[in-house]
Regions:
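Alpha-helical subdomain
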Residues: 215-379
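Class I S-adenosyl-L-methionine-dependent methyltransferase module
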Residues: 113-275, 368-379
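Conserved SAM-binding loop of SAM-dependent methyltransferases across substrates and taxa
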Residues: 102-110
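N-terminal secretory signal peptides that target proteins for export/translocation
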Residues: 1-11
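Bacterial N-terminal signal peptides
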Residues: 13-29
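Boundary at the C-terminal end of the N-terminal hydrophobic targeting segment
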Residues: 34-38
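Mature N-terminal segment immediately following signal peptide/propeptide cleavage
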Residues: 42-87, 94
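Conserved class I S-adenosyl-L-methionine
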Residues: 90-101
Length: 379
């Protein structure tokens, strides 16, 4: 597939690397704490024009990231974190995240009023717009999978079918080239004509590349493409993450694990309330612009999923800028960072669901001078 599309897969290992402590302390601004409150000034929906204007006004130009394509997550901890968020009572407010489909699972767990997904790569924005279109057109989970991978829908799948049974029904079904062409045309039609979004030539090419990749690799698509994805995806596939990522009780948890979860995410997309943004976590604009927008409307951040982005921020000397940016977001005592790699390292919820305000205060006091220290959630 890589030869067919003329793309070069980067053979970078993706083992977690803990950057050494390069600085003795980080100068971080004090977090903006707000009282727990109803966020009734947040919009119940955004018009197409307002949604697209918001994407444009908040976004920074697309930037470089070491992983050129990031089609899926590779974090199998998502099922555990889903249930941990539910048990902790992290609920409502505004969600922020990074990366592809795993955000929908955290959104399904938290049930926020709206969400912002920030990624340095502009292609990530186009991938989320692809997801948006499919969510809006697909009535249920089986139709979502059918459209995403251009596979005819098997019979006898309904709202009561378990996600693993849905995947078992799809495995023997071959992808269909006619459906692929038709689905892609419908996606473009919905985004550009129905919604009125305008894309550059590069953005249109990115949208097609992403959809072609899901068609070409099928449900075994992983971070960089196929299983293992050229040395960086650790073999975890889209099907694994949505159907076989279990919580501590052995139950699969994802945005596709129940019809209710799917319907919630679909509803936010249908009201233009999942906003994809191109921006650098350590950059000058995106996160701060989101913070200003939320402050104006009384919004409160409930959770910020950061994956392992902090690892790269410490390597690039941008961690202090990131924490400074986060300090401009409206948070309260319940607001948390979601850090899967803390769960992998420590196995406790207090590290992996790290309270944001106390952490930022600890960072100001020099207690988070490295990625390794940040993962421990000093407070």
């Amino acid at each position: 597939m890589t030869t067919h599309h003329g793309r070069r897969w980067m053979a970078l290992g993706w083992r977690l690397f803990f950057a050494p402590a390069l600085i003795a302390s980080i100068q971080v601004a004090a977090p903006v704490r707000v009282a727990a409150q109803a966020t009734d000034r947040l919009p119940e929906r955004l018009s197409d024009a307002n949604f697209w204007a918001l994407v444009d006004s908040i976004s920074e130009p697309g930037g470089f990231f070491r992983i050129e394509d990031n089609f899926t997550s590779n974090e199998r901890e998502i099922g555990q974190l889903y249930t941990m968020l539910r048990e902790r009572g992290t609920r409502g407010g505004v969600y922020m995240g990074v990366g592809p489909e795993q955000n929908f699972t955290y959104i399904a767990a938290i049930r926020p009023q709206m969400a912002f997904i920030v990624d340095i790569r502009r292609q990530a924005v186009m991938q989320h717009l692809m997801f948006k279109a499919i969510f809006e057109m697909a009535a249920d989970r089986a139709e979502f999978i059918s459209m995403l991978f251009s596979k005819p829908r098997p019979p006898a799948l309904d709202s009561t079918t378990s996600i693993q049974a849905i995947w078992e029904a799809f495995w023997p079904v071959k992808s269909d080239s006619a459906a692929w062409q038709s689905n892609y045309a419908r996606i473009v039609e919905l985004l550009t004509r129905t919604h009125g979004f305008t894309f550059t030539a590069d953005e249109s090419a990115q949208l097609k590349w992403v959809y072609d990749s899901f068609y070409g690799w099928g449900p075994v698509i992983s971070t960089r493409g196929g299983p293992g994805g050229g040395g960086g995806g650790n073999g975890t596939t889209f099907a694994d993450l949505t159907g076989y990522s279990n919580d501590a009780s052995g139950n699969p948890r994802s945005f596709l694990s129940s019809e209710e979860n799917y319907a919630f995410v679909k509803g936010l997309h249908s009201r233009n309330l999942i906003v994809p943004v191109s921006g650098d976590f350590g950059g000058p604009k995106a996160i701060r612009a989101i913070g200003a927008w939320l402050h104006e409307r009384g919004g409160v951040l409930s959770a910020f999923y950061v994956s392992n982005v902090e690892q790269y921020l410490f390597q690039d000397g941008k961690a202090a800028s990131f924490y400074d940016n986060v300090s401009t977001l409206p948070v309260n005592e319940a607001s948390v960072f979601i850090r899967p790699y803390s769960l992998r390292r420590y196995g406790f919820s207090i590290q992996s669901l790290c309270p944001i305000a106390p952490f930022l205060e600890a960072a100001r006091a020099g207690q988070a001078p490295s990625n390794n220290a940040a993962l421990a959630c000093p407070r």
